[in-house]
């Protein structure tokens, strides 16, 4: 019996939620073999990569998901958050501006903007000095 892409995606999500990461990855990749730009499979595989500290692997997956469906706010959030985690601050700011232009929820973007600010703040030298 042939399964539809949606059925395979649901199986992947179920495996992912159950912590069966290898099975989830296999299922997401099986979708991407026949539908390389599938937004949910790319996004979910990116989320999986982030969960095992493979941020660099997640970035192109999130970007592909976003290019395939720029209306999904979660795709914007995931991509910007991954850029911040990867210390790509300039790129994160650029994508954040694009998200605002697309009408992504301001509260969500404000949270990411705070994360960006925290990453770019210079440490206070007084706090770095050893106590006398």
What are these regions (language model features)?
Residues 34, 68, 85, 101-102:
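Structural marker of alpha-solenoid helical repeat scaffolds
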